[in-house]
Amino acid sequence: MTAAQADLQIDRPRVADGAALWRIARDSEVLDLNSSYSYLLWCRDFAATSAVVRDGHGVPVGFITGYVRPDSPDTLLVWQVAVDGTYRGRGLAATLVDGLADRVARERGITILETTISPDNTASQRLFTSFAERRGARLEREVLFDTAVFPDGPHEPEVLYRIGPLSAGG
């Protein structure tokens, strides 16, 4: 971690973190907000493929959630990345992506990282493009879910970013 991150700690989420993750996602005003229940389940069932960053008091101020795809055990899909507004600009999102990719590669042998990003989310586009560059990995993009498949009203398409093969962190 950098000097700007020195007072922070990254570890696996716990069920007790679910409400804070839900609030951080809600306050991001960019992410699709899932139910509070889903964040609680995520912290219980997918803690091994997710991470939380805590302030000096142990309070979550950022998170990354992901899972290993059941039909592609070499692939980590990153579901959401968010950092509390007061902690943005410190490189925490990149630290979370790098740290999670390294941990899951070490523990589960993943070589590919995937995520989906809507066309208007330029911050996430930059985050994952720079991740691919740091890893010297190929980045492929294709529309995974077009607007027409979303049943709940207008939704931008979700573009799949597929990054790999991954090399060790930089």
Curated annotation (Swiss-Prot):
EC number: 2.3.1.178
InterPro entries: Acyl_CoA_acyltransferase, Ectoine_EctA, GNAT_dom
GO-annotated molecular function: acyltransferase activity, transferring groups other than amino-acyl groups; diaminobutyrate acetyltransferase activity
Leading EC class: transferase
One GO term (biological process): ectoine biosynthetic process
Keywords associated with the record: Acyltransferase, Transferase
Keyword Ribonucleoprotein included in the entry's annotation: no
Domain N-acetyltransferase: 8-166
Pathway assigned to this chain's UniProt record: Amine and polyamine biosynthesis; ectoine biosynthesis; L-ectoine from L-aspartate 4-semialdehyde: step 2/3
Source superkingdom: Bacteria
Keyword Transmembrane: no
Similarity field: Belongs to the acetyltransferase family. EctA subfamily.
Protein's name according to its UniProt entry: L-2,4-diaminobutyric acid acetyltransferase
Species for this entry: Streptomyces coelicolor (strain ATCC BAA-471 / A3(2) / M145)
Gene transcribed to yield this protein: ectA
